């Protein structure tokens, strides 16, 4: 059984991206800051931002609804609320559910878990193995 892998912090991602791109951390951090600000700006303007083959952010309105105050048991009205949502593409969902295992920082994919119609997953595997 694999040990639980912790999510990377923002600074760890900046460090790794800097190494992968062979650029200074300052440049990578500046790019990430700008990119995040751009995504927020576009989401506030267009109400939807697509991230290539990863997924999309979307602004949704959660309708007014009834709820129960857990302390008093009293029924309360929860007001309408605007919230951001993120939805992954079908391809990413397939990859996540495709029998991927991680051992000592290496990723292996069980090819037997794919259906014939898993185009995106097949493309991903081919490009990763080359």
Swiss-Prot record:
GO terms for biological process: chromosome condensation. CDD domains: HU_IHF. The keyword tRNA processing does not apply. Keywords: DNA condensation, DNA-binding. Pfam families: Bac_DNA_binding. Belongs to the bacterial histone-like protein family. Histone-like DNA-binding protein which is capable of wrapping DNA to stabilize it, and thus to prevent its denaturation under extreme environmental conditions. PANTHER family: DNA-BINDING PROTEIN HU, DNA-BINDING PROTEIN HU-BETA. This is DNA-binding protein HU. GO terms for molecular function: DNA binding; structural constituent of chromatin.
